[in-house]
Amino acid sequence: MTLQAAGIVTEYNPFHNGHAYQIAQARQKTGADVIVAAMSGNWVQRGEPAIMDKWQRTEAALAGGVDLVVELSGAAALQPAHLFAQGAIAVLATLKCQWLVFGTEHPDMDYDCLMAHLPSDPAIFKRFDQTYASLFQGYLREQTGITLSAANDILGFFYAVANQQQGQPLQLVPLARRGSQHNDTAVMQGTNYASATAIRAASLAGDWATVQPVVPAKTLALLQQESLISWADFWPLLRYQLISAPVTDMRQRYQITEGVEYRLKRAALEATTFADFMRIVKTKRYTYTRLQRQAAYLLLQALPEEMRPQPQYLRVLGYSKQGQAYLHQIKKHVALPLVSRANRDWQKGVGSLDDRLGALRTLVTGIPQDYGRIPIKKPDSE
């Protein structure tokens, strides 16, 4: 029997009840035999370190119903929404997924209408969606009457754009989000759903009574047994980097433009915590997520040529028995290298950037992230 796969682009930061609902809906809406997750690695799209590492989050995903977890590399994950979407669509298409299932505030959004009114000048489009997101959204509203402001609506739109640009390899299946909004900062009492933002805040505070109702048991157990990570853990490393690096070197890093390097360096001298640093550097011109990504690029010493979102390889993080069967089915038809074990060649070659991202986390946690690590196999009993 030929297995058919539905793809999900995700971060599982951490895996919560809303994600479990999405997986169940994906199976119901598509009839897929396999759920494939393209999951951000140790750093996520907001420019933050994931609260748990990619292996812990893979374990939670497999327990929650995902069949195959493949890493969305840092070159795609640490990007503005349009580039994040390009990389994610390419990963799922390369893995021969038939559907892309994604949560959105407005599942009836007319993506075709929006795409028909994109700016004709690519340079303007790039300027809008990287630096002037609000102008871009205003432009589309003026052209179409459609308001594109909610986080998942914006990401869904860029999935549609990327899918069109890549020849529409995936059938889009938008789902109405269940529960709280994407960036809600508090867990509402009496509910089984909360935003990942609120769950991270409660977890970092050790408020397990608040977390318990809104995450599966496996996620709760992992959160309670692991050392949880935030930007605060990397602040000394970032501060040293910003203070010691010449501005001429900083300008060579990815997306460090328009003189922001001077502002970041001054803030590093003044601030004593990462929260202080962000407060000092924030302006109306730049969002917090853009500034956090710039901080991550500098910490990582990322060069523009390293940050191309199109995948160069596919790193398998984990699978169920069904996921393993699907991998066996497609492996001869996948155009990119499938990496199950990171070796020295991977570290020195296509995996260099992700190896550095993992090494940064290892500096804080002491847990190796890449070299020699093999995919997690979901126990048959789960």
From Swiss-Prot:
UniProt: ATP binding residues: 9-22, 103, 152, 177
EC annotation from Swiss-Prot or TrEMBL: 6.3.4.-
Subcellular localization(s) per the UniProt record: Cytoplasm
Major localization listed first in the record, in broad terms: cytoplasm
Cystine pairings recorded for this chain: none
SUPFAM superfamilies reported for this sequence: Nucleotidylyl transferase
Lineage top rank: taxon: Bacteria
Root EC class: ligase
Family of this protein: Belongs to the TmcAL family.
Function statement: Catalyzes the formation of N(4)-acetylcytidine (ac(4)C) at the wobble position of elongator tRNA(Met), using acetate and ATP as substrates. First activates an acetate ion to form acetyladenylate (Ac-AMP) and then transfers the acetyl group to tRNA to form ac(4)C34.
Protein name in UniProt: tRNA(Met) cytidine acetate ligase
UniProt organism field: Levilactobacillus brevis (strain ATCC 367 / BCRC 12310 / CIP 105137 / JCM 1170 / LMG 11437 / NCIMB 947 / NCTC 947) (Lactobacillus brevis)
